[in-house]
Design a protein with these regions (language model features):
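Conserved acidic catalytic loop of the alpha/beta-hydrolase fold
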Residues: 72-90
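Conserved HGGG/HGGXW glycine-rich cap/lid loop of the alpha/beta-hydrolase fold
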Residues: 7-63
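Active-site acidic short loop of glycosyltransferases
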Residues: 6-8, 19-21, 83-89, 110-111
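Conserved donor sugar-nucleotide recognition element shared by glycan-biosynthetic enzymes
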Residues: 70-78, 127, 143
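Flexible "cap/lid" loop of the alpha/beta hydrolase fold
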Residues: 100-108, 112-145
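Conserved alpha/beta-hydrolase "nucleophile elbow" surrounding the catalytic nucleophile
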Residues: 28-30, 90, 94-96
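Conserved alpha/beta-hydrolase catalytic His-Asp/Glu region
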Residues: 126-129, 140-199
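Residue in the alpha/beta-hydrolase core beta-strand immediately N-terminal to the catalytic nucleophile
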Residues: 55, 91, 114-117
Length: 200
């Protein structure tokens, strides 16, 4: 694992395998770190993929500067990390917030992506009140105020019963998310609208 100064902040990242035409860059969801991809890495390395993972601005071991953030800014962070690593282009995979970053990579940095893999994401968030409630909850009560509800959304009840160890890892990942980073990224998600910029 390493850090680089990227787009004005230090970004924490990890490279696994060999960087090649089969390199995938992973962008994590809100309230998670690059470790959310741990279970996929061994399988992908066995297929010859190189892997770049990073902690988003405001998350994990990356800096969490005061907001505002935007999805454009988060995509520019990813592109700037590719610059400092001297990597021309990658297959870009994003989950949830990371999927929003993937879409914006396609809009702002199309020459840096060979393909986009967008999982459980959206181009627009109509439920502004929901995001405002989460922001207010975390601002007043820290990440403890949203951790249980987040786990219930992310993992089915049967999954929670079968994989208690994984659930606890995810719980700690959420709890360790900096409040300032969570709030600023939530504001970015709330404000996002790529329905016009995305090609039909």
């Amino acid at each position: 694992m390493a850090k680089h100064a990227v787009n004005g902040i230090d970004i924490h990242y990890q490279i696994d395998g060999d960087i090649s035409d089969k390199t995938i860059m992973f962008s994590n969801s809100l309230a998670s770190t690059l470790n959310m991809w741990d279970l996929q890495i061994e399988h992908l390395l066995a297929q010859g993929f190189g892997i770049i993972r990073y902690d988003s601005r405001g998350h994990g071991q990356s800096e969490a500067p005061k907001g505002p953030y935007s999805i454009e800014m988060l995509a520019d962070d990813a592109a700037a990390l590719l610059d400092v690593l001297d990597i021309e282009s990658v297959h870009f995979c994003g989950l949830s917030k990371g999927g929003m970053v993937a879409q914006m990579m396609g809009v702002r940095h199309a020459d840096r992506v060979k393909s986009l893999i967008i999982a459980d994401s959206a181009a627009f968030m109509p439920s502004k009140d929901t995001w405002e409630q989460r922001i207010q909850a975390v601002t007043g009560g820290g990440m403890e105020a949203v951790v249980d509800a987040t786990i219930e959304r992310w993992i089915t009840s049967s999954g929670r019963d079968r994989l208690p160890g994984q659930v606890e890892l995810i719980r700690q990942m959420i709890l360790n998310t900096p409040v300032q980073g969570f709030v600023a990224c939530s504001e970015a998600i709330k404000a996002m609208d790529m329905r016009i910029t995305n090609p039909k």
